[in-house]
């Protein structure tokens, strides 16, 4: 019996070798699958511009529209992560490139299309061009550019301060976190606008708050209330935040996005896309540190 066992053991290295080879093959196949799977993403982070046609234009307010673009393939996703943006470009009649960053509001997992919510600025070169387009016209895009790579449960809570179209990257965060059953991060959004009609993505935000009432808390602020508006009238004040928002803590991260005057008032401006600059304004006065505040 012992002799038989001894003879059978001599095949053990061969068996182990075959097993190791099988594992190695599986790993290689998995890697190849991952690489091949990248083709299901429209944007791969390279330097290639992709022309996407407009398939739908929806008016959201007197100066804001939602543009829906078709991705190159119906089974593709955009390739963006939370939180990231893409670059949009058009070429002027004289051959100059006009490039602007935009944060899609469509879900990262949405196939075949991508949505942008854009506000028209009277002297804005890109927005004036975009608002002059119609369905089937194309816009060039490339990216994505990662601004902040969100990791579930990195914080107990996040505080979001936004105004106008600054809601776009904030909505991306709210939607991504709330719809992830594994992410328990509490969300506190304070969103300011001129009138109730100017509140962008309100139905989407309200639906998330209704669906996840224990996780998502949203407070709207308007300069002038009308009708049955549910929210606050006036600015998002220092006093309001000191009493209602989560206290400064390493367990609470703040994200800010809005027009320049808004950024100046609450966090101070960014120096550049790569340089957050110093933390000033209301958040600094409330005791938040630079490491606890991110400016989109």
Swiss-Prot record:
FAD binds at residues 154-189. The gene is MCR1. GO terms for cellular component: mitochondrial outer membrane. Residues 47-151 form the FAD-binding FR-type domain. It is an enzyme of class 1 (oxidoreductase). This is NADH-cytochrome b5 reductase 2. It comes from the Eukaryota. It is found in: Mitochondrion outer membrane. It is a single-pass membrane protein. CDD domains: cyt_b5_reduct_like (cd06183).
